[in-house]
């Protein structure tokens, strides 16, 4: 009995030592997992870094092209035109809001005929006025920018709802009509645009856009026409 009691503490110490040894043996396995995870994470992050670099490169090219734009023309009538169109749109909205009131008052005054007449007059000034102003001012170029990197021009016009419309073109895309229409200086892809030559910062841009730097074409028909020669021979 005394021998068993003496061996029990030693057995406890032996079990503790075995536990520590087993823990030390499992450590390399954990280290392998950690090292494998550390090797796989950079491989997974490589596509993300590539996408970020690609996005940054595309963004940098866009900013460079935007910064390269030079304003060479500014329409002095642009602020007044915006104010007039804004006032017209506001009065049109007020006219739409007043339509039920006009209808009610017309029914009280003269019945259905008077109500239709008042609504027609109110609707005419509500819809026709902003459309007429837009028809006159839609060709007016408020700003004209030039990109020396691509040698392209960007013309800015105003839409019906006071939004900017940008038209990018090159001098080869410009067509100057023989008989210019009302408020039309040149055509870009069959779209008329109007500019004031005196408002250009550099007149050379206007000369380049209008094609005045090219040789003059007198449109002389110097090619022989066989039909005309036949008719002249028959007369002789």
Swiss-Prot record:
GO terms for cellular component: mitochondrial inner membrane; mitochondrial membrane; mitochondrion. One of its GO terms (biological process) is mitochondrial proton-transporting ATP synthase complex assembly. InterPro entries: TMEM70, TMEM70/TMEM186/TMEM223. Residues 1-64 form a transit peptide. The chain crosses the membrane at residues 83-103, 116-136. It is found in: Mitochondrion membrane. Keywords: Membrane, Mitochondrion, Transit peptide, Transmembrane, Transmembrane helix. The keyword Membrane applies. It is a multi-pass membrane protein. Belongs to the TMEM70 family. Scaffold protein that participates in the c-ring assembly of mitochondrial ATP synthase (F(1)F(0) ATP synthase or complex V). Also binds the mitochondrial proton-transporting ATP synthase complex I and may play a role in the stability of its membrane-bound subassemblies. Associates with mitochondrial complex I assembly intermediates during its biogenesis. This is Transmembrane protein 70 homolog, mitochondrial. It comes from Drosophila melanogaster (Fruit fly).
